[in-house]
Every structure is written in C-alpha cells, then in structure tokens.
C-alpha cells in the first residue's frame, strides 16, 4: 500500500526548512509513488515532518508494575509524544535476565505495543549485582543492550566482566551510575535545598565516581559504555576527558535535568523527586554545555511512571521518577529552541539520528529505504501541560501548567498511523 504525506516541510542538512512530500510504500520511505498508486494521503500543510523520535531510556513497568504503566499505555504515551522507537528498561518483576523471560516479554510487546519496543536485558541475575546473566543467550533472544538501570553495579570486577562479555558480542553496557555507599539515604541533591529542608542529600560524587571508574574499565575491556541520565558537572568533565582519550563512551541527558535544578523545586512536592536528583544550577549549565559540545550524545526521557498514591507520599518516602514521553519535545522546543540556545535541527538530531547511531539502529532518518517512522509537528501550536490528558497511566510530572509550543500532531511507525490529532485527514 502506498501513501503520500503532502504539504509539510523537512529540515535539510543545514537545518533549513524545505517543502517536501514524503512517499511511503510497504512501510518504507520511497523516492516517489505514481499518483494512481497512492491509496492514502495525509494533509501535513504547515507541519514539520521529522523522523520518529527514538528514546533508549523508558520504564514501561510491565511485567509486575502494571498499576504504574503497561506496555500498551506506555507506548500510547510514546506515540502521543512523537516517539516511534523506545527501549524498555529491565527493572521489572520478573527481570528479563534469561532467554525465557525475554521471550515472554517480547511476546507481550508484539501483542500490545503501538510503537516499536526494544527490550533491554539485565547485566546481573535479578539485578542483584552478584552473578552475570548469559549475555550470548540474551543477545540471541533479542536483547537490545545490557543494563541494571535502577541500581549501579557496585563491584568493579563485576562491571569489568560484563564489559568484556558485551564487547565480545559487540553489545553495549548501559549504566546507571550510583555508588550505594554515597547515597546517604538521600531524596534530593546534597545542596542548599537539602540543607534548607533538613533532608539527607545525594552528593554529585555518588554518580561521578562510578563514571570515573567505568570509563577506565571500558578502556581495558574495549567496550562500548553508555552512561544513563548524566546529572553533574563532574560527570560531564569525566566523560569529556574519556572521549578525548579515545575511550568508547557515550552519554545521555534527560529533559528534566536540562530544564530544572534544585532552585526550581516547589515546596516538598514529590513530583520533583527523581534519580539522579535535580542538581545545582552550575550542574544544569554544564549539562547544556556538554550537549552542545558533543560530550553528551543525545536526549533520553527516563520516563518513570508511578501511581498517584505512591507520589502522594512525603518527599522522603515517595518513589523516584517522573514521566516524560508526552512532554519532552514541546518543553525542549519551547525553552531551548525558541530562545535560540539550541537550533531546531540540533534538537531533532538529539531525539532521532543521534540515539539511533549510538546503538547502530536503522531508525531516526528520512532517507529513502528507511522505515517510514514519522513525527508530524505543529511548531506554532500551543498547549498547557495537563497531566489528566496524558495517555500514560503516570501523571507524575513537575511540569503541570507549563505552556508549550511545538505539539506533535501525528505519529507513524513503518507507515502506520499510531497517533493523530484532528488535522490529519484522508486516511
């Protein structure tokens, strides 16, 4: 079946807006389709036609956490936010730490996901940090990469072994960097906010010391080491130095760490509680600078839904994490592109081709022959963030009430429309 997306514009290699019709056949982008062969047509007049967004850090919670989110609700949220490919973190119950569990997870993905879902496998059995999983069997079963995200690998020897195993299979080790001996039972960053509210704080070095250790281990193992949700200036410096030394390290940053710091926390609202925590303003500034200079490779949401009951607890007792799939692009476009800090092309690249290239994925592009994963965006449309409108089960966001521009209007995965607003017609 052939389709034509007409009237929109794309960004060329220089970031210039160019009017472009996009032709789709059999789920792939093609150069042209004869008018007589077109069976569906979308009116994208005035819309940016972007490659579908790629998010390599999403918590879908299923199996075991279906009260927070399911594969179905999480991928519907992804589609609404313009994401066509997401990678699902393994901190579920049970953990996908063997081929059988990974097979069951992939069957569930096939049944209920509305966007493409790539499953992570865990580095260690049950994510306990004590025994390596069977990397070879998990790769053969379809693992995207290996991570124990949610907890850090505490033993250097265990991490080195994991990196050697992954390197032999040309797979990435993806790390949540946190030294348990330095957490201090903290709920927020160890800074002036913690002091003012009498709270235990998590120091910056809790994250940075693991990165400093791991880049040396990655060098020794010859592994691709990817750092999740970088949050501190020390981490940025360490990654920058490692890249200069030729170590194969990549890194991501979340929208919330780019947008917020501890100064922005309102009262003791648990919707401002995430891990890693919101750091100092100089850390936030270092993250923006690191993204701009290439130290940080791309943006990932760390979408982490929780129930309203869980997030209604005190700041000290509520779980870490916020949702992000449905707010990422509008927030970043409004607060970084419109003021001129980022170009539109930079933002699109950090959400598409950059994560795809980092993990050797054939997505995030509008090239002929690529999967027809498209996100159609009205850059002039405005909305106020309203959690009651989220398709995610999780409503836990610190951005409620924020006004944003740049609203996704439709999302297509392999040529199939998985999300749309009213203006997309003639399906």
From Swiss-Prot:
Molecular functions per Gene Ontology: allantoinase activity; dihydroorotase activity; zinc ion binding
Annotated Zn(2+) 1 binding sites: 57, 59, 149, 302
Keyword Metal-binding on entry: yes
Any one biological process term the GO annotation gives: purine nucleobase catabolic process
Residues the entry annotates as binding Zn(2+) 2: 149, 176, 229
InterPro entries in alphabetical order: Amidohydro-rel, DHOase, DHOase/Allantoinase_Hydrolase, Dihydroorotase_CS, Metal-dep_hydrolase_composite, Metal_Hydrolase
Active site: 302
EC number(s) reported in the record: 3.5.2.3
Gene3D superfamilies: Metal-dependent hydrolases, Urease, subunit C, domain 1
Family according to the record: Belongs to the metallo-dependent hydrolases superfamily. DHOase family. Class I DHOase subfamily.
Descriptive protein name: Dihydroorotase
Gene: pyrC
């Amino acid at each position: 079946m052939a389709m034509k997306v007409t009237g929109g514009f794309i960004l060329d290699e220089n970031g210039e807006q160019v009017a472009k019709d996009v032709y789709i056949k059999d789920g792939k982008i093609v150069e042209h389709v004869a008018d007589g062969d077109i069976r569906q047509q979308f009116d994208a007049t005035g819309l940016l036609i972007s490659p579908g967004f790629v998010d390599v850090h999403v918590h879908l919670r299923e199996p075991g956490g279906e009260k927070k989110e399911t594969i179905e609700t999480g991928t519907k949220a992804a589609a609404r936010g313009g994401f066509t490919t997401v990678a699902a973190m393994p901190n579920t119950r049970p953990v996908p730490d063997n081929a059988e569990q990974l097979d069951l997870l992939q069957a569930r993905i096939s049944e209920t996901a509305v966007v493409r879902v790539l499953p992570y496998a865990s580095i260690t059995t049950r994510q306990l940090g004590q025994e390596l999983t069977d990397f070879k069997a998990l790769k053969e079963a379809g693992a995207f990469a290996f991570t124990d995200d949610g907890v850090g690998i505490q033993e250097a020897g265990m991490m080195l072994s994991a990196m050697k195993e992954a390197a032999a299979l040309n797979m990435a080790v993806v790390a949540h960097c946190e030294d348990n001996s330095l957490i201090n039972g903290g709920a927020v960053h160890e800074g002036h906010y913690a002091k003012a509210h009498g709270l235990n704080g998590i120091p910056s070095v809790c994250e940075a010391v693991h990165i400093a250790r791991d880049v040396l281990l990655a060098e020794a193992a010859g592994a691709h080491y990817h750092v999740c949700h970088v949050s501190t200036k020390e981490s940025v410096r360490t990654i920058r130095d490692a890249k200069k030394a030729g170590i194969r390290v990549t890194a991501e940053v979340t929208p919330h760490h780019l947008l917020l710091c501890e100064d922005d926390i309102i009262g003791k609202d648990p919707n401002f509680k995430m891990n890693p925590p919101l750091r100092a303003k100089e850390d936030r500034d270092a993250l923006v600078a690191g993204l701009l200079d290439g130290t940080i490779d791309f943006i990932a949401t760390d979408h982490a839904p929780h129930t309203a009951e869980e997030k209604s607890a005190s700041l000290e007792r509520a779980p870490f994490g916020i949702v992000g799939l449905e707010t990422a692009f509008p927030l970043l476009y409004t607060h970084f592109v419109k003021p001129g800090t980022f170009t539109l092309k930079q933002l699109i690249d950090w959400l598409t081709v950059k994560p795809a290239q980092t993990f050797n994925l054939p997505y995030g592009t509008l090239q002929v022959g690529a999967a027809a994963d498209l996100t159609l965006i009205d850059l002039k449309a405005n909305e106020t963030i309203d959690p009651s409108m989220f398709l995610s089960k999780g409503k836990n966001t610190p951005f409620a009430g924020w006004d944003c521009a740049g609203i996704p209007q439709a999302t297509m995965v392999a040529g199939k429309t998985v999300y749309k607003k009213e203006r997309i017609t003639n399906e």
